Amino acid sequence: MNEIYLIGLGNPGKKYFNSRHNIGFLLLESFSKKYNSNFLLKDKLKSSCSEFQINNSTFKLFLPNTFMNNSGDAVRAIVDWYKINLDQILIIVDDKDLPLGKIRFRRKGSSGGHNGLKSIIEQLQTQNFKRIRIGIGSPPITNGKNHFNTISHVLGNISLDEKSILDKVYSRVIESLEQINTKKEEYIINELNSFDKDQP
């Protein structure tokens, strides 16, 4: 049976639950809920974990409890515990440099300034792992763009208007993940990267 390891990036705790930076958590929680599976804390993996099957595939979902900037600690623990190849993991992460609702599936790449990805790259000593980036848009410019604006934006709560867009994104990504072992990866990459949030 094929096993897929999905790791959503975010910050634990109610304070950050609905923040833009927690899109990785929110998407995987939506996926897990669809299959009536609950997340359980596993200290050895430094994550909350959920598991379910779709056809002949076992999906293992992880929400690191390390906080975003130390996400690599959890990913390292997961990789070591399950003794898996890096091509079996897929990271779900927010991206402030992509327009709201835009999806980018990449097989490898730099952190792009994202501290969660930076931590993973440092722990794994490679950039060669798959990731799905979900756009949250840039912070509004007031008196010129500044660092504080960026922090406030990514840690700010998702608005109702944003949620209506992101719900479409979650559905699209989940639908593609469900087919990850029945369709060629290139097809799924193209499907996600061409997603248009404005289509009905």
From Swiss-Prot:
Its EC number is 3.1.1.29. GO terms for biological process: protein quality control for misfolded or incompletely synthesized proteins; rescue of stalled ribosome. The record marks 94 as: Stabilizes the basic form of H active site to accept a proton. Its main location: cytoplasm. InterPro entries: Pept_tRNA_hydro, Pept_tRNA_hydro_CS, Pept_tRNA_hydro_sf. It comes from the Bacteria. One of its GO terms (cellular component) is cytoplasm. PROSITE patterns: PEPT_TRNA_HYDROL_2 (PS01196). The active site is at 21 (proton acceptor). Keywords: Cytoplasm, Hydrolase, RNA-binding, tRNA-binding. The record marks 11 as: Discriminates between blocked and unblocked aminoacyl-tRNA. It is found in: Cytoplasm. It holds the Pfam family Pept_tRNA_hydro. It is an enzyme of class 3 (hydrolase). TRNA binds at residues 16, 67, 69, 115. It catalyses: an N-acyl-L-alpha-aminoacyl-tRNA + H2O = an N-acyl-L-amino acid + a tRNA + H(+). GO terms for molecular function: peptidyl-tRNA hydrolase activity; tRNA binding. Hydrolyzes ribosome-free peptidyl-tRNAs (with 1 or more amino acids incorporated), which drop off the ribosome during protein synthesis, or as a result of ribosome stalling. Catalyzes the release of premature peptidyl moieties from peptidyl-tRNA molecules trapped in stalled 50S ribosomal subunits, and thus maintains levels of free tRNAs and 50S ribosomes. Belongs to the PTH family. Monomer. This is Peptidyl-tRNA hydrolase.
